[in-house]
Amino acid sequence: MTKTMSIRMDRENYEFLTKITKEERSDLSKAVRDLVNRGRVLLAVERYKKGDASLGKAAQLAGLSVVQMMTLLAEFGVESRVEKDDYLEGL
């Protein structure tokens, strides 16, 4: 289910988004959704690195499965703190 929202942003960010949409031949809504999704992933990685989130919580925050999150963390060069429960959760 999708929701519609209205946001305010400064001119610099608006121009940045407009530029991206032109380069990618996309629309503004898609660019915002993509950036939000990327932000979720980066937030999840950061919280996992700091120890503020377990692997399962980080995966949930990023909108990924535990296995996908493990792969993503490896791509970011983040050392895994996988415990037995985390491993079993990913199966």
How does the language model describe each region?
Residues 30-34, 46, 60, 71-72:
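DNA-binding alpha-helical recognition surfaces that contact promoter or target DNA
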Residues 40-50:
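Short, amphipathic alpha-helical "recognition" segments used to contact nucleic acids or chromatin
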